[in-house]
Design a protein with these regions (language model features):
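N-proximal helix/coil linker or "cap" segments that precede and/or mark the start of modular domains
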Residues: 1-3
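A short beta-strand-turn-helix
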Residues: 5-23, 64
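Short pre-active-site segment immediately N-terminal to redox-active cysteine/selenocysteine motifs
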Residues: 21, 28-31, 74
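Hydrophobic beta-strand anchors of alpha/beta hydrolase catalytic cores
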Residues: 24-25, 55, 78
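Typically the conserved alpha-helix immediately C-terminal to a functionally engaged Cys/Sec
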Residues: 36-49
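Structured functional modules or segments
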Residues: 50, 57-61
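Structural microenvironment flanking redox-active thiols in thiol-disulfide oxidoreductases
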Residues: 60-68
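Non-catalytic, surface beta->alpha helical segment in thiol-disulfide oxidoreductase systems
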Residues: 74, 82-107
Length: 107
């Protein structure tokens, strides 16, 4: 598993999900203020959970196919995928402890 934040595309999304047990995906866009506010938290999660999960970002404007597949209608949306299945979804900007809690349940 990677130890850094990775940037997914429609082309790389499925392979990343298939090759990793747990993946946290931040669906975001550059124009979204709450998404920009969440970015440091996502970067911290990538460092702190290094070796345990893959933390990734997917720009919904550049990769609409995956966003549509996951029915992402509001951003930021953070989806936790375990064994290729969505197990948690957090919509909107939330406190850090909410993301940690979701991850701890599935490690």
């Amino acid at each position: 598993m990677g130890n850094e934040l990775i940037h997914l595309t429609d082309a790389t999304f499925q392979q990343t999900i298939d090759n990793n047990k747990i993946v946290l995906v931040d669906f975001w866009a550059g124009w979204c203020g709450p998404c920009r506010a969440l970015a440091p938290t996502i970067e911290e999660l990538a460092k702190e959970y290094s070796g345990k999960i893959v933390v990734a970002k997917l720009d919904v404007d550049e990769n609409p196919e995956t966003a549509e597949k996951f029915q992402v209608f509001s951003i930021p949306t953070v989806v936790l995928i375990k064994d290729r299945c969505e197990v948690e979804r957090i919509v909107g900007l939330c406190p850090r402890k909410q993301y940690d809690g979701a991850l701890q349940k599935h490690l």
